[in-house]
């Protein structure tokens, strides 16, 4: 640090040098102009000057004034302003030096006491820890002794319990035997008593019959005399006849009651405590049962009411397709289009009569208007054609379908040529030039089908169309080169398709071959050898010398055996298009790999947008064949056009229906393509949400250096939450290639380039598939845009915000709206057509909508604080004086990724 001289200090405090030298001398510090000044000397000079010129003031007073304007309401709705001035005074007193020293000494003593207390606490804690350890040791010894005693007691109890259980079982067996003997004696006694009762009943009945025969004559004379007495007195006779009729009727009632009560008991619940009603109901039922014919009908007709139910609105069965216009929906329901538009407005959707609405919206509107809805799928014809097929029931093992992938010049073609030349049957017409993109080889352990596809284009395009044709991927890596960029791309494609990988380490016969280096490099990309605990087989081969080819084929068959590949051999065939082209003399030609069933010459096939009858079939040798089973590639002729690679091939029954399905698919192709383009847009990813599932943002990342790739990948993966996850489908160093674009199209991913650009072929794929391609040079911009896309996929948070409060002062009736509350707005603003709550004693008693809002008989949209208004609550009339009406609105708060 530079020393401060007297001259520089004088310049700093703006005083002459001679005067400053004199002041130093007066303070007892002799100095010259060029001498240095220390901080201690500055303090000494300052203290000298304070003593000489007087000390600093003991008090300091500060004053502050603030002015504001207050607006208060006046009469007539006007307001006036009042000026308010607030004055504040604050005095600061300098502390006495002796008092300061005393306070400092007290603070020092307090700190020392706290330190002493802390040291004592530490000592106490140590002693307590030692005592606690001793107690725990003693308790542990005691617990061990108790546990041993309990185990001994448990062993004794177990032995005694076994003896007790044996005694209990013996006692239970004896008890069951005694109970069975008692039950047998009781049954015999009941049978004897029943027999005696039946004999007594027969004896009484015989005596009654005999007495009736003996007294029959006496009873007849008495009845005759009684009839002559009745004729003498008409009134007595009439009353007696009436009583007899009533008695006879009562006997009928009593007789029928026992029969009808059981039948009506379950259907008619009986009320307790109302005996009169019960007996009356029983009497009515018994009389109805006793009368027959006309009486029963007359009773039913007399109880029938004359009121007839009014006719209901006609409920129709409405068939709705995937899309429908509002006008067509109205015609199907036989109502006016304005009624449908009104119903949609009630549901919160605005539409015109010619607007196309989706199936779900149309279903909601039709059901809201009381009609029954039947949903019709547009692809019913396609489903009917696909379901009308003969398929065999028994599945058999099939040959694996293998795709060979790898970097350029690593020996893919040489490996294929060697396998073809040694394993394919001799007599191939024209040699290699006759192959059709796929061939199969026969080995001692089984058959293998190889797809001879250039690069990864066909592999990825088939996966993009949903056709999983490949079972196993053979990754060819040169032992002298190791892992190269296209090797990494092949690994990413295989992982995205979830296909097992068998690694063929080629050029093993070269001197610079390093097998361990290849294993180490591949393990960094998730391809672990079996000897390292992974799942991938590493086979050293040489396509030039033929070393290890048989081991490679056996490894493929072993992997296929683990996968348990099976297919139905009989029935109509189905498969996938490997490649297709237009031949000048033969027309559209397609190479088909059969997956299930048997493809025969003359079958009618449906292939994507094309259809036709198989006029000819050729195998990979160029020979005519009549049929092809599972995992067999063939070349077929007879299609109406050239299909796309990866299209599904299906054999159907009817050529006419196949043509209709093909035309329907052509019409739907544009809609599907637009939907896929819209789905892959970064800004529209929030529209692809479904409640209750985890959303994914798929990214294909390319950067200029490996460090940038790793940094960006880590940053993107850290953005993942429980609701939205970032998935890196593929990443690498270098420009964006056609393979990257095809991978992004197959995975519905966005392409991100960091300091790199796309080549011409990649731009062509990006334009044709309308992929979302982003270029960045700043990593923070990349992270922010992906974070914004993820935030758009989060569902918004709904929040209720109270905007106004009104107090009910009076209630009056309106013929149009019912009860109208005369209110004074006490807080905020009351807005029309907003949801409200009615509060009574600070308790919510109703929640609904504000229907009418008036001020001085004029309809208004809002009423502000301090004004009176009339409020009509929709569908609610129980408004009382003193209630509070709370108006609120629901706002959506967009969530974001933190």
Curated annotation (Swiss-Prot):
The keyword Acyltransferase does not apply. Residues 397-566 form the tr-type G domain. It is found in: Cytoplasm. Its main location: cytoplasm. Residues 542-544 are annotated as: G5. Residues 452-455 are annotated as: G3. GTP binds at residues 406-413, 452-456, 506-509. CDD domains: IF2_eIF5B, IF2_mtIF2_II, mtIF2_IVc. It comes from the Bacteria. NCBIfam families: IF-2, small_GTP. This is Translation initiation factor IF-2. The lineage of its organism: Bacteria, Pseudomonadati, Pseudomonadota, Gammaproteobacteria, Enterobacterales.
